[in-house]
Amino acid sequence: LTACRLSIYELDKRLNEEEAYYTNINPEDYYKQSDLLGTKAYTAVDLSVSDSIRKLDTYVPSVSIRLDQAKAEKLGQKLFKADRKDFYKAFPDLFSGIYVKSDYGDGTVLYISQVQMDVVSIEYVTDSITGIKLKSKVNEEKDSIQYTGRTFNSTREIIQANRLANDTEAIQKCIDNSDWTYLKSPAGIFTQVTLPVSQIAEKLEGDTLNAVKLGIPIYNETSDKKFGMSMPRNVLLIRKKYKESFFENNQLSDGVTSSLFTPTSSTTNLTEYTYNNITKLINDCLKDRAAADKEIQEKKSITFQTFNDEGKIENHTVNNIKDWEELSDWNKAILIPVLVTTDASSNGYYGSSSNVIGIQHDLKPGYVRLKGGLKGEEKDSQGNPVYPENILKLEVVSTNFGSTKAK
């Protein structure tokens, strides 16, 4: 029941539809304090609503903000005078958008399922056939008027950019922990996985790679908090080189550049993120290595780009495949909590099924501890792992001359 407050401002410039916006966006660049449209004090539970209504299945909790009357009328006049032709194209120039700011209160998280703008206007009552304005009463000159309303829902076509900030010291403390690793959303910690692609290729020795299974154990968390952070349930394993373009281009997991973990509906307690077959992803890594080796042989060097820990691009030029392997992130993958959108389709014989139609960064607060950590990279003088309990295991199935074997 913590008291909170929202403020809404009108944007003074358009968001570029061709540009990708990240959680470090600076809202100050897009609005002025004087362009305040409205404010609303609220609590997570609206006590003005009776228990009998709140318990109804049809009840939907909401926070409604009434916009400043003068500014709403000014906007209405601009929209009314605008050219009706291709109005949807002209609308962003007339109204660039809004910035919703939480400017009072903490400790409260609202999960927003829908955003809508309700517009109320006054119009003349007309005859449905002739279109002639009707009089309010018989033998009176005064025209009859009525209130009408329209609802405009926010859809995926509307750019929604979120500003998120974390406690950098607390985040870094988690990252520096060598006993395990973390996933934390939103915009917090993504775990990097180093895949033993070279070792797999050496072990195969010409065998056909059939299946590669990766399991990432989850450490159980105990908490007595009623409203604690939940564990991410949908996690994307994606090659590091594609983690930016995947979300910018609204791509789906193809099994080659990425693999998606989604639990079944019957799964209650997660103990492991399991990727049953990342064979195509491993082969994609090997394909990159072969292409790099070929370019080095032909051109004597290769130039490539990587992203550093701050997300900035770094350029590299090397003249041997060993240095390329060391710097290129060719065998690196990232674990990212995601929000998965599905559609529903039915089949008379097999029942209903669903297809993934969208994958986005999960903006719901959540975290989990995973097996791994920097200790898994430590080796003794003979090259053996010092902490084998921190190393993840891959199950590899290959075929050689008609026989199948697991390694």
Each model region followed by its residue ranges:
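Secreted, disulfide-rich extracellular signaling modules
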Residues: L1-K407
